[in-house]
């Protein structure tokens, strides 16, 4: 039987950077009992994004954060848009260079992720507001 469901996660990161949300998504997906289908994850913000990234080695996430510090530095003289502080425009740049939506296949009731892959909220602001992450899955139910 075809089933389609959605929900919204509220996520508040403790700091700027990558914060794994795989388990929260997995718990919700398990509760919906979808055997095979497609999961869509959407971050409804312009200063945070979603990435699939290495989930075992913290150093990989730290290196990624350092790279983004170089690509989009907090330097007010570089930007005209700074309405919410020196991290405002760099946060928008970081978001533009990543993604706000992910599509992940579901097979045998599980997300199809590689061994070392995790789903992360990539928070680009220091103020770390609560983020809304929309989840939607469509597929064959158990």
What is the meaning of each model-derived region?
Residues 1-142:
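Active-site histidine-anchored catalytic micro-motif
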């Amino acid at each position: 039987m075809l089933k389609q469901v959605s929900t919204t996660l509220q996520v508040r990161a403790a700091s700027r950077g990558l914060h794994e949300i795989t388990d929260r998504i997995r718990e919700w997906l398990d509760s919906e009992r979808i055997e095979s289908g497609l999961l869509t994850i959407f971050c409804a913000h312009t200063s945070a994004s979603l990435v699939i990234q290495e989930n075992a080695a913290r150093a990989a996430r730290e290196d990624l954060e350092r790279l983004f510090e170089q690509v989009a530095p907090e330097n007010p003289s570089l930007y005209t848009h700074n309405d919410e502080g020196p991290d405002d425009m760099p946060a928008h740049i970081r978001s533009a260079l990543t993604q706000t939506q992910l599509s992940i296949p579901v097979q045998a009731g599980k997300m199809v992720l590689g061994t070392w892959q995790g789903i992360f909220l990539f928070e680009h602001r220091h103020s770390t507001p609560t983020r809304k992450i929309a989840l939607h899955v469509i597929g064959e139910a158990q």
